């Protein structure tokens, strides 16, 4: 029985899924806004939000856990120096997922994923909605 197995497999092997979500997470943390397909965006929320929650408690163990999930030192530093303090008073729900039409070519539903309360320095949304 498949009770409570809600993971989207996205037609990928487990190692491919892990690498894909690690890359999406690092891109989202670096740019604070990305454009991807809607199923990937919904599954990305399950990966990113616990990592940001780790940043609210800056212990050595949580830094090691964050590095284990991301494998990117710059993003780990950003989580604990910027994002943790930014979301200190927010209990989850750090992402906004906006539907933005369908992709030309395969008609896949697309979405924009962004961090809430993102800084004005990261408003480099030039052609994100095309």
Curated annotation (Swiss-Prot):
GO cellular component terms, semicolon-separated: cytosolic large ribosomal subunit
Keyword Transferase: no
PROSITE patterns xrefs: RIBOSOMAL_L17 (PS01167)
Gene Ontology MF term list: structural constituent of ribosome
Keywords: Ribonucleoprotein, Ribosomal protein
The family this protein is said to belong to: Belongs to the bacterial ribosomal protein bL17 family.
PANTHER family: LARGE RIBOSOMAL SUBUNIT PROTEIN BL17M, RIBOSOMAL PROTEIN L17
Protein name (Swiss-Prot/TrEMBL): Large ribosomal subunit protein bL17
Protein's gene: rplQ
């Amino acid at each position: 029985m498949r009770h409570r197995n809600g993971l989207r497999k996205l037609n990928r092997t487990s190692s491919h899924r892990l690498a894909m979500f690690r890359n999406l997470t690092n891109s989202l943390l670096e740019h604070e806004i990305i454009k991807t397909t809607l199923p990937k965006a919904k599954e990305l929320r399950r990966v990113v939000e616990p990592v940001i929650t780790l940043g609210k408690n800056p212990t050595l163990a949580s830094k090691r856990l964050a590095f284990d999930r991301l494998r990117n030192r710059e993003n780990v530093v950003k989580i604990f120096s910027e994002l943790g303090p930014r979301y200190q008073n927010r209990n989850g729900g750090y992402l906004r997922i906006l539907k933005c039409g369908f992709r030309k070519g395969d008609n896949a539903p697309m979405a924009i994923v962004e961090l809430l309360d993102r800084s004005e320095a990261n408003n480099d949304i030039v052609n994100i909605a095309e």
